[in-house]
Regions:
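Structural motif detector for alpha-helix initiation sites
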Residues: 33-34, 123, 216
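Pocket-lining segment of extracytoplasmic ligand-binding domains
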Residues: 71-164
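Secondary-structure end/capping motifs
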Residues: 127-209
């Protein structure tokens, strides 16, 4: 969306092959299918724009027609919303622990398959700070690989040094679900395809969120192209001198 708006952002890597974002509602007789979400009260958290094409397809709701996000998944049993944005890695476990029956609706069910936990930077950073970008990217990938290979160690680390209120069982659930979305056993962490980004852009276009699919070649990080561009810039400066 930012690239389509003309902002010079660059995506470095897609850490999750599938986004954890989905819609969740309480199990109730009047909400059985996505079409039943029409005329219901959706509550979306900031940064969940990827759910709008799915929601718009069935309800014609747009971003300005959703409720302000507050209280998280507890908004459902309190009757503050009929359906909310949620992460498959966390909210289902919370409702399970509370013994509350729920139903989920995922954009993936109709082919809206977004990447998750993407790393972004700016064109300026890519072309002027190549070494820093590379170090950051490689460190991030290394960290993710280690976390996937040592989930118990990461859980202990979080509980001891970065307590978030989530207990061991909740963190273990999150680790399992994250691994399923990342698929590190069959896909290299960070891997992404231009064709898939193209399809994501078309999904936004069909929902009326962007006017046209932008040129995505400069949007996807390519260390070789960045190096060549920097070399050309240095050569141009040398010629000018």
């Amino acid at each position: 969306l930012a690239r389509a708006a003309g902002r010079p952002v660059v995506v470095l890597a897609a850490m999750l092959q599938h986004s954890p974002l989905m819609l969740i509602t309480l199990e109730r007789p009047d909400i059985q299918t996505p079409g039943d979400l029409a005329n219901k009260r959706p509550m979306l958290e900031p940064g969940s724009n990827e759910l709008l094409p799915y929601l718009h397809r069935y309800t014609r709701s747009r971003q300005g027609e959703t409720l302000p996000y507050e209280r998280g998944v507890q908004a459902l049993p309190r009757g503050q919303a009929d359906v909310i944005s949620a992460y498959s890695t966390t909210e289902p476990f919370t409702l399970q622990q509370q013994g509350i029956p729920y139903r989920v609706f995922s954009p993936r069910d109709i082919g809206y398959d977004f990447y998750g936990d993407n790393l972004f930077t700016s064109e300026n950073e890519v072309f002027n700070q190549q070494e820093r970008v590379q170090r950051f990217l490689q460190a991030s990938l290394k960290g993710w690989r280690y976390a996937m290979d040592h989930p118990e160690e990461m859980i202990n680390l979080i509980l001891e040094h970065y307590p978030s209120g989530a207990g061991r069982e909740a963190l273990a659930f999150e680790a399992r679900e994250t691994r399923a979305l990342m698929q590190p056993d069959i896909i290299e962490p960070g891997y992404m395809q231009q064709d898939r980004w193209q399809q994501i852009a078309r999904t936004y276009q069909e929902a009326g969120m962007i006017k046209a699919v932008p040129n995505l070649t400069p949007f996807l990080y390519n260390s070789t192209q960045a190096s060549l561009r920097q070399q050309r810039q240095l050569l141009d400066r040398s010629v000018a001198i």
